């Protein structure tokens, strides 16, 4: 397959480099285009008010200077390359993209951007203990890469254009994974309050509070799958219409 690979942790992150290596070893043609720095939680932000610069780092490797994940995929699918791609893969993200995380996630946003050319897309995340955006533990990126290799043939068989799968993989050895579950997005409680402090010069600064804990995490959710050592696979789409409210709202107005 001809695969476009991006992420939000940056070109030099271990996750994307591990996945690129494994996909190429499996015989896939992989073009990597990723931000030159960490752009976690950039969501679908696009750079519109200034020019974008792209650096070529290898035959099929590129970084976008100060770009976002959505910038990377948008550029790749809209004229930067002459190549025709079969699939967009985003990841391996260093941390979870569960429940409400997908709204903010640059990893998921890169996959969503693949819909422009009706391409199926995968957003892949490794879920372990996390603090301040960094994973702690064994960091089994090889496990997540193998899961992607397991899923790819099945995705081809589905033959569904614009299908987006949000995949979260437990940070465990591959042999310890119990299987894969198709799930829905769970839900987190509201984030913790902001943290207020002062910089060395006495100016007030703020940090956003930590993610809320899972409150909708029952059987069938992505949170449940990860808590029980399963890979979570959630089909998602970009249509944000609240279809159930259309009739009620029409009658009210």
UniProtKB/Swiss-Prot annotation:
Cofactor note: Binds 1 divalent metal cation per subunit.
Positions of transmembrane segments: none
EC numbers for this chain: 3.1.3.5
Location, primary (coarse class): cytoplasm
Binding site for a divalent metal cation: 8-9, 40, 93
Gene Ontology molecular function: 3'-nucleotidase activity; 5'-nucleotidase activity; exopolyphosphatase activity; metal ion binding; nucleotide binding
Catalytic reactions on record: a ribonucleoside 5'-phosphate + H2O = a ribonucleoside + phosphate
NCBIfam families the record matches: PRK00346.1-3, PRK00346.1-4, surE
Function: Nucleotidase that shows phosphatase activity on nucleoside 5'-monophosphates.
Family: Belongs to the SurE nucleotidase family.
Protein name: 5'-nucleotidase SurE
Species the sequence originates in: Haemophilus ducreyi (strain 35000HP / ATCC 700724)
């Amino acid at each position: 397959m001809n695969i476009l690979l991006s992420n939000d942790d940056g070109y030099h992150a271990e996750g994307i480099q591990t996945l690129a290596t494994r996909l190429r070893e499996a015989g896939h043609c992989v073009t990597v285009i990723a931000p030159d720095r960490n752009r976690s939680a950039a969501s679908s932000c696009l750079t519109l008010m200034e020019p974008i610069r792209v650096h070529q780092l290898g035959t099929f490797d590129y970084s976008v200077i100060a770009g976002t994940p959505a910038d990377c995929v948008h550029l790749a699918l809209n004229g930067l390359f002459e190549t025709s791609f079969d699939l967009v893969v985003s990841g391996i993200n260093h941390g979870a993209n569960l429940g409400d995380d997908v709204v903010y996630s640059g990893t998921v946003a890169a996959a969503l951007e693949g819909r422009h050319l009706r391409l199926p897309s995968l957003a892949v995340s490794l879920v372990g203990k996390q603090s301040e955006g960094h994973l702690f533990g064994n960091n089994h990126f090889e496990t997540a890469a193998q899961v992607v290799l397991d899923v790819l043939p099945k995705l081809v068989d589905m033959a569904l254009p614009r299908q987006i799968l949000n995949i979260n993989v437990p940070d465990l050895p591959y042999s310890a994974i119990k299987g894969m579950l198709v799930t829905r997005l769970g839900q987190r409680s509201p984030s913790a309050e902001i943290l207020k402090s002062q910089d060395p010069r006495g100016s007030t600064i703020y940090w956003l509070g930590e993610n809320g804990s899972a409150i909708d995490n029952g059987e069938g959710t992505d949170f449940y799958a990860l808590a029980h050592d399963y890979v979570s696979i959630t089909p998602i789409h970009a249509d944000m219409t609240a279809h159930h409210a259309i009739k009620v709202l029409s009658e009210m107005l």
